[in-house]
Amino acid sequence: MGSGDWDEIKRLAADFQKAQLTSTLQKLSERNCVEIVTLLLEKQMLEVVFTNDGKEYITPDHLEREIQDELYVNGGRANLVEVSKTLNVDLSRIEVLAERIAAENPSVHLVLGQLIDEDYISHIAQEINEKLVLRGEISISELASQFDLPSDFLQHDVVEKHLGKIIKGRQDASNPRVFFTQAYIQRCKAKIRGALAAITRPINVAVILQQIGVQEKIFHSLLDEIAPAGQVTSKLANSQYVPLIYAKTQADWVNSFYKQNSFLEYDAIQKLGISDAKSYIRKQFPNEEFLFLKRVALGARLVELTVVTALNECSATKQYLDLTTILPSNLSEEDIEEVFSTIMGQKHSNPNNFVYLDSIVFSQPYLAQLVQPCQALAESQAKAAVDGGVYQQYIVEKTLAQKGSVSTQELEDDGKVDKRDERRKKASSGKAGGGAQGRETKTKSTKKHQRGKAAAHNDSDDEDDVQQSSRGGGAGNKKAMKPLELVKTADIVKLITASLEEEGLEHLAKPISALYTNQFNQTALARAQELFEATPQTNRRQTHAAIQDRINTFLIDIRLYEKGLKLFPLETQTQLVKYLLKSLGNDICNELSLYVAGECNLTVKNTNLNVDQRIKLAQECEVQYRASLLEQNKALNKTIDEFELATETVLKACSMIIKKVDKKKDRLLIADHKKKLQNQLLECQEPALLLHLAVLILFTTITGSILHASGKFVSAILQHIRGSLNDEQNALLLRYHDLVLQVLQATPDSSESKVANEHLQAMQVQVVELAQNFSRASVFKADC
């Protein structure tokens, strides 16, 4: 056997021995491995974390090591979302392990879903230090924006933790979120000190900061350390820096001006750059007292030693004082007047002793002596007014005006309320209607047009009727009568001008006269009253004649109105007669009752009397008047003839006569009445009153008679005149009448009322034209 064979035998023996010594290796299939792991998991003998695709799993400890590896690989800052994507593990598992890592390791922080270790914090601390050295100042808000980290984390765990170590700087005491270097503070101090040293006039702090590039908060914090030669007005946005040299110049100018003039002008102080002049004056002169006016401030010494002293002397000598001679020439007339008013408003002053006019102060005794000649003027004017009858005429007109201006509230009493209730009952029962399908138009009554000097008084028929004056061509309520002017301003001017010219004050003659015109006019009126009362017989005769004329005018009116109302049916006639007597008849009773009261020396407070008041007054009169007055009051509820007979009896008792009737003037009076109605119609804008006026005009045109009727008779008048109008005219008036009723019955702000008013406005011109242009010829043509 050769050597080669022996070597082969040794090799085979070695392989066999190796096979004997090696244990048998058993291989498991993948399925067996899965079953084994599942069993271990079920028995909680093993804990693993599956990947998102479920094909792999890993133990939590190994996953924790891989998360730490990712933190290291990313430079000490790892986003858990990115780690979850990289490791292919659910984010919730990553977050749980990240919290455990941060809890177990103090050098690792979990911040807003990110793991950050101390190495990264040291790195950004170095970056912050480099930036701070470069800029000199940084804020936490800037760092939070740069590093995308919470500001609290940056402040406490990064900046403050490494402040003085890695970060070379200091924290702002006023704002802990700001950090700066000492070199930056020194540069800011140098800039501020240099800028303030160069300023010589007040300048806005914002302008300074803009020029030197320093933040406002640092400026105010370093200002006290710098101790500049000036002061900042405030720490607000609009604050100013005022150099001491400028403030000293201001103070020197103000002190010098006040020392020379004893007053200070606000405008002059404001031109120095001082906004609140009054406060500055108080601060600059703490021991001085000032009189602060609208435009200037006067020193108390100037006021007391000059003005007050001069006023006292003026009062004692009974002269006048020109304030412009004792006050500084810089003061305007408004300033001087304000000085005088302020002094007069003080406790120790008596403004009644002086009169101020155009910078001149007059003492009352001086003016009294100046206008003394006007007393004789008032006496002579009063005598002339009484002798010429001017004052007597004024008394008559004043009495009539007072009657017409008595308010409705003063006229109401219990008896009148009862009558109103009675009228409401009649209206609700339908007795007041008639004509135009029984419609009743509740409108304002037209004016009572009467002839003569007197004006008619207010109607009292309907509470909704608006009663107006009978004279004046459509004028409204009577205005307050002006007092008789016996002494005029021009008269006083003539008397005092000569005296004022001697003093060079003639330009004040008219203002002084205006002050005393009313006083002397009242004196003249009082004297005229004395002279008038001294001649009672003359006064009585004139009053007697005036009332006699008015009563005759009333009776003529009633006669003309009676002709018109007789054209209506009996039932309507009765209502029209009642209305006529309640209005014009009531006025006649009032006139005669007041005259008799005056003859019997009885005092009557209310000149517009009702029936009960007239009965009471008649019972207090003398026997010769009593029976006739009582009978006249009763006749108001009877016929017109009975009322006229009763009135004649009263007139006879009063020694008055009834003028003879002149029927030739009837046509002229009727034409005058119609003309006044037409004038009122042209001025009227209220639909109900416009319809009322139109039908009265048409009635007068058609019948040749006048009618005294309130608004509730409109429907009856329309029914009466419809036969004289064509179909189109009747339709127009009837449509307008229906719309007026619709407006009166609807709520003022309702849509129905607005639509009706629009239609009325559109039809107004046609109704006015019909009333104004309708003529008797049209009536005759219609009849044909």
Swiss-Prot record:
UniProt GO cellular component terms: endoplasmic reticulum membrane
InterPro entries: Ufl1, Ufl1-like_C, Ufl1_dom, Ufl1_N
Comp. bias (Basic residues): 444-454
Protein role: E3 UFM1-protein ligase that mediates ufmylation of target proteins.
Family: Belongs to the UFL1 family.
Keyword Oxidoreductase attached: no
Biological-process GO terms, alphabetical: protein K69-linked ufmylation; regulation of proteasomal ubiquitin-dependent protein catabolic process; response to endoplasmic reticulum stress
Alphabetical list of Pfam families matching this protein: E3_UFM1_ligase, UFL1, UFL1_C
Protein name as it appears in the record: E3 UFM1-protein ligase 1 homolog
Tree of life domain: Eukaryota
This enzyme's EC code(s): 2.3.2.-
GO MF annotations in UniProt: UFM1 ligase activity
Keywords: Transferase, Ubl conjugation pathway
Keyword Transferase in annotation: yes
Region (Disordered): 405-480
